Amino acid sequence: MSFRGINTTVIQIRRQVFTEVARMAYANVKGEQANHLMRKIPYTIIPGEEGKLRKDIFLERAIVEERVRLAMGLPTRRMDEHNSVVSGLEDASIADKYYDPPLVNVIKFACNRCPEKLVKVSDLCQGCLAHPCMEVCPKKAITWESGRSTIDQDKCIKCGRCVTVCPYNAIVKTERPCAAACGMGAIHSDELGRAEIDYSKCVSCGQCLVNCPFGAIADKGQIYQLIQGFNRGDRIYALVAPAFINQFPSLASTGKLKAALKAIGFCDVVEVAIGADLCTVDEAHDFLEEVPEKLDFMATSCCPAWSMMAKTAFPGLAKNISMTMTPMVFTARMMKQADPDARMCFIGPCAAKKLEASRRTVRSDVDFVLTFEELAGIIEAKDLDLASLEVDPAEQDLIHASAAGRGFAQSGGVAKAVADKIKEWHPDMDVKIASAQGLAECKKLLMLAKAGKYNGYLLEGMGCPGGCIGGAGTIADPARTAVQLNKYVKEAPFTDPEQSAFMSNIHVLKDDPDFEL
């Protein structure tokens, strides 16, 4: 389970790191002054002379140092080599700098070396006469010793049947939280028992980093580079994903959100749900053209973790992933065409969007990617009094996207929007859809599709539980966000994506003069 909505110590430290990195960037200093500020951050976050978290203040500060480096887009340091915390800072100070892979990293000396998977009998065992645990074990791994059940770990296959039948809940099944959260099976143990990521499988969804109770996993960020752009006077647009709802309770209205984003340095704010409207229409066209004549089924393309998983784990199905641009790319490209000298910053719930933005085909459209958590750190660093922010009456709301576009933020929303559009064009057509959330479930969906169970279907996959609102970069509890999102969808100024004032741009953005609505 993740800890969104619970203000744990791990989350507090993560957000403090974002805030202090942003403060350092706003200070706009170079050289030794910048080095000094960076070296100071661990002492600001972990003050005093005694460790309170791991009983070793030097270890606590060393871990914070690595988190600071990653938040600035710098790589973690090797443990067997001497390397200053400020190593590479000069390169990171360039506003055009983008981080090098890998995006998601394990801070090795922060890892607790949790067991990969274990079933064990606790002290709650009552030594009952029925001992159903022994009876159901398919490998006869449970025996009776000293008046209680004992599990032979060499025989145990971790099936969990004993856990289910124990009347005292005395048998527990534990698993490394980061590995349990990884739907790709990309996390295993290194030779020292620490978590290690197999990057040939990892799709950077970020679920491991929000599920690690020790805060040993973190992703790279562009907070520092973005603020360098502000300092330089660049015109930078904030492209805000619809999952922003409920993430910032102090910003009770979209007008307040826009005011806050402009106060920290953005020139204007655009809702990415506009791009979702364009995506809906384009994907509906794709489905009608491709299925079933050319493809057995078509899968949506909006979630980069889902599409990357499909192409990595099921290379033969890569052709079934829609070629439609994601809402982020549609929106960024549209704004770049309207303001060619400006730069674009996507602000959303997703770690995988950072990976998407680094692709060669997207890099020229999207300059920066921030998560909502990182944005919260920047707002904190700016010391904004959110309650007294003045809202321009002419710009009180984000009112340029449809209800369907706003609904992309929730699992099932993309497929529903596309299917509804197809049914509008072809009322007699039965559009069958299926969706999955979380990469493990997404893999099951594609396995069934590969076996021919979903021929003629439109499939939607969301890498995070709940969809975008459950992304690794969110702040609020996804269940509560879902309630607020549904309200936000109902408040949209129109329902049909084709009513968008920006729909006429679609053929230009696709570079397809023959595209017709």
Residue ranges, per PLM feature:
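Extended, highly charged accessory segments
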Residues: 59-62, 66, 84-89, 97-102
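A secondary-structure boundary/capping signal
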Residues: 121, 152, 198, 240-241, ...
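N-terminal [4Fe-4S]-dependent radical SAM core
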Residues: 93-122, 139-140
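Iron-sulfur-associated redox domains of electron-transfer enzymes in respiratory
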Residues: 1-82, 219-517
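N-terminal pre-triad scaffold of radical SAM enzymes
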Residues: 118-130, 155, 201
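Gly-rich Lys/Arg/Thr-decorated short loops/hinges at beta-loop-alpha junctions or inter-strand turns
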Residues: 112-120, 143-148, 189, 207, ...
